[in-house]
Amino acid sequence: MAPNIRKSHPLLKMINNSLIDLPAPSNISAWWNFGSLLAVCLMTQILTGLLLAMHYTADTSLAFSSVAHTCRNVQYGWLIRNLHANGASFFFICIFLHIGRGLYYGSYLYKETWNTGVILLLTLMATAFVGYVLPWGQMSFWGATVITNLFSAIPYIGHTLVEWAWGGFSVDNPTLTRFFALHFLLPFAIAGITIIHLTFLHESGSNNPLGISSDSDKIPFHPYYSFKDILGLTLMLTPFLTLALFSPNLLGDPENFTPANPLVTPPHIKPEWYFLFAYAILRSIPNKLGGVLALAASVLILFLIPFLHKSKQRTMTFRPLSQTLFWLLVANLLILTWIGSQPVEHPFIIIGQMASLSYFTILLILFPTIGTLENKMLNY
């Protein structure tokens, strides 16, 4: 019998083993769709970003007007920009749901896959931050000023580090130029790390909602999950296009329609919605260094999750106490997101401090404690 080129060709067999003949658990739910959706988001962002970069000028005197020119005069420029801006929001929606799935179903026990995933999240956050600065509106400028200034809280080297990052004594032309360079480069780094992420995943195979070995009941990825992924894509595309075409500025800040002005500070400096939870944690601590450490810890804590797993069961499917705690954490993150968008005044300050404290308490103390308690309950 003639060899199948799909299985013998050096390049095609890699694609075959990753996307066609890959053995997958027969019972993975729609929560396993977000990985492929993230891949689609990345490809969309790289494509729209490339088209935008062709019309963008990374210069403080021209950046704002070059973006306006793209929207007004370039064929479908308005569409490309709206897809790119709102694509970032959907990228974060998908990654948050993907991480939530990992937490709920104990996927973090594949440590290498989990750690590369956390690195991907950090890289994505960096990419989104530098990208937000590029239109050079008021919130772009002041967001860049406030967030880069946080590095000055690092003892001894802080101020030097900030001036080195700025390329001067304030956020100015060199800052914009390097941020554009980074924003162009990082998505390709994300694509590279994604391949590493998948390589580690395919070493162990996918987890499943029961958290048990699925070796005895595997099905080929194609056609089952390839079609399921396409269904997931169409379901995501509907709200995405609705947002991008009907209310493209819903999630943006009106302040960014004003060109950057170092002499006028906006009344409320706040990042895009997907950073608000971390911003709320940063603001909840009155000390600058303490706030920066809490901000870093709010995301870096994900690296600790595999070590805080004390339950004898992998997933939360049959652990009602842990489930309650998980949804409490979700509610807590929504409260933090809301607080991050509010001004620093009573009662928002105390609510933010309580929510920040409970965020770390749930992850560091309550999850391991409840896991141990559930183990004990299994004996009775």
From Swiss-Prot:
Residues given in the record as heme b b562 binding sites: H84, H183
Molecular-function GO terms, alphabetical: heme binding; metal ion binding; ubiquinol-cytochrome-c reductase activity
UniProt-annotated binding residues for heme b b566: H98, H197
Taxonomic superkingdom: Eukaryota
UniProt-annotated binding residues for a ubiquinone: H202
Coiled-coil features, chain-numbered ranges: none
Cofactor note: Binds 2 heme b groups non-covalently.
InterPro entries registered for this protein in UniProt: Cyt_b/b6_C (IPR005798), Cyt_b/b6_C_sf (IPR036150), Cyt_b/b6_N (IPR005797), Cytb/b6-like_sf (IPR027387), Cytochrome_b (IPR030689), Cytochrome_b_C_euk/bac (IPR048260), Cytochrome_b_N_euk/bac (IPR048259), Di-haem_cyt_TM (IPR016174)
BP-aspect Gene Ontology terms: mitochondrial electron transport, ubiquinol to cytochrome c; respiratory electron transport chain; response to oxidative stress
Topology class, membrane: Multi-pass membrane protein
One protein family per Pfam: Cytochrom_B_C
TM region(s), chain numbering: 34-54, 78-99, 114-134, 179-199, 227-247, 289-309, 321-341, 348-368
Keywords, comma-separated and alphabetical: Electron transport, Heme, Iron, Membrane, Metal-binding, Mitochondrion, Mitochondrion inner membrane, Respiratory chain, Transmembrane, Transmembrane helix, Transport, Ubiquinone
Location of this chain's protein in the cell: Mitochondrion inner membrane
Cofactor: heme b
GO terms under cellular component: cytoplasm; membrane; mitochondrial inner membrane; mitochondrion; respiratory chain complex III
Stored CDD domains: cytochrome_b_C (cd00290), Cytochrome_b_N (cd00284)
Other comment: Heme 1 (or BL or b562) is low-potential and absorbs at about 562 nm, and heme 2 (or BH or b566) is high-potential and absorbs at about 566 nm.
Function, as annotated: Component of the ubiquinol-cytochrome c reductase complex (complex III or cytochrome b-c1 complex) that is part of the mitochondrial respiratory chain. The b-c1 complex mediates electron transfer from ubiquinol to cytochrome c. Contributes to the generation of a proton gradient across the mitochondrial membrane that is then used for ATP synthesis.
Family: Belongs to the cytochrome b family.
Name the UniProt record assigns to this protein: Cytochrome b
Organism field: Gallus gallus
